[in-house]
């Protein structure tokens, strides 16, 4: 995918919606590639009450939203600006968020919806492990306390299914609510590229909101896995780092875990998949261990799950050799 700058849209309630002492303003950053973008409010001077949601990848482009809750009086229209920066395209956009005034009292005017809907893919480990259940997740955020319940409908290749598990809505720290629906899916349905659609409806929405997701299209390519022992310069410290480099794989869905003498290890961190110039991806994983455990000759194993691999799994081990 080529570098694409974002489009930025202000999200503001109408004056009729500003009945309490606070008002939530939003900023939708849509259709950019690659990650990341940064969103600040009033060039960073406004940080309290800010909630920026994770980016979602659809059709090879990213979308995210950010909201800020501010006092509704005095009117914030002169002071609230959403600042968006996309370094990859050298794009900087400033959008002033102006609450709409419909000029009619006490009528209710049509306003942009502040609620946002996101759809998330199943975890790669769930898709590639036959004993686990992969799930596609649909999340609605920024639901007002006074809004009616939202209804979820799910479709697989445009055929409605009724097996989703919808949780009661949960109150968030900013006094809005979040509603989540999870659809258990068949492993092969995801791997074969079927399309999953979440339709969200509510009396508070002017129209249903639909989000779709499917596996990234393209021929799977198995990763190459390399393990790297701690550098000599680190051996003077109490803790050392073992590195696993996983490269040249496609699509980006991958699981990387570590074991220590066959038991799950926890003290590791993975990077997000990063695109190579040829369209494949690479990931680094770092496991921190006590130097004494490394020097004792314990075996540390980097375990990788990816659909391009034989049996979807491979692993590489490393251990300290005396005298090295």
UniProtKB/Swiss-Prot annotation:
Keyword Manganese: no
Keyword Metal-binding part of the UniProt annotation: no
InterPro entries: Ig-like_dom (IPR007110), Ig-like_dom_sf (IPR036179), Ig-like_fold (IPR013783), Ig_C1-set (IPR003597), Immune_Resp_Modulators (IPR050380)
One Gene Ontology term, aspect cellular component: immunoglobulin complex, circulating
Family annotation (SMART domains): IGc1 (SM00407)
GO annotation, biological process: antibacterial humoral response; antibody-dependent cellular cytotoxicity; B cell differentiation; complement activation, classical pathway; defense response to bacterium; humoral immune response mediated by circulating immunoglobulin; immunoglobulin mediated immune response; phagocytosis, engulfment
Entries under PROSITE patterns matching the protein: IG_LIKE (PS50835)
Region ranges (Hinge): 98-110
Single annotated GO MF: antigen binding
Stretches the record annotates as CH1: 1-97
Pfam family of the protein (one): C1-set
Protein name, per record: Ig gamma-1 chain C region secreted form
Protein's organism: Mus musculus
